[in-house]
Amino acid sequence: MSTRRLPALLLPLALLAGCQNNQTLKEIGNAPAMSPIGSGLQFSQTPQMGMYPKQPKHMASGYSLWSDSQGALFKDLRALNIGDILTVNIQINDKADFDNETERNRTNASGLNWKAKAQILGWTPDADSSIKYGSDTDTQAKGKTKRSEKLTLLVAAVVTGILENGNLIISGSQEVRVNHEIRILNVGGIVRPQDVDAQNIISYERIAEARISYGGRGRLTEVQQPPVGQQVVDLFSPL
């Protein structure tokens, strides 16, 4: 590679490293901007969602006061339509401890013997050969994983879609800015209207396809992350 092309190849990498963490020029010296209201409402229906069977419609007969939005006679109205709001109770307290150990031994030995004898014009040559070969492998592996996670909070979510079978698609976000750091919480998934309690609250373990994200952005996050240029070098470095 020509030495003249090297600066041209390094220039885009340098520009990329200077724009790490999507920091804009407006945020230099200022607190990071918060997202507009409503930007956290995400709804992207996959083809698999359209395969659910349609929910049969329950028509009130006579003077019936039954309503599917309640699901019980003595409960308050719960979120059922697009745009309704419900509260998600997140209480994650997970612990995992794995200790795996593997040992593998293998020994293989083989041999080959052959003998040849012939008579040519009164001369009898004799050939004898022996070949032996073998292999021996030994593999030992040990792995251990230990982690503990705890997250407790309440967040409001909005019904952004309704599946054919009546299940609700919810999406919600919450942003809290303290000084120059923003903490961002995103939650989304599919819930059954029957799982929403009388207080219009649903627990996180009853959310199917749950996507819960708790992170942040700001000055502290930028310092903790390595530069983009270093990440690219670490990704493609053979050593």
Swiss-Prot record:
Keywords tagged on the record: Bacterial flagellum, Cell outer membrane, Lipoprotein, Membrane, Palmitate, Signal
Entry membrane topology: Lipid-anchor
Secretion signal, residue range per the UniProt entry: 1-18
A GO term, aspect molecular function: cytoskeletal motor activity
Positions of S-diacylglycerol cysteine lipidation: 19
Subunit structure: The basal body constitutes a major portion of the flagellar organelle and consists of four rings (L,P,S, and M) mounted on a central rod.
Protein name (record): Flagellar L-ring protein
Gene behind the chain: flgH
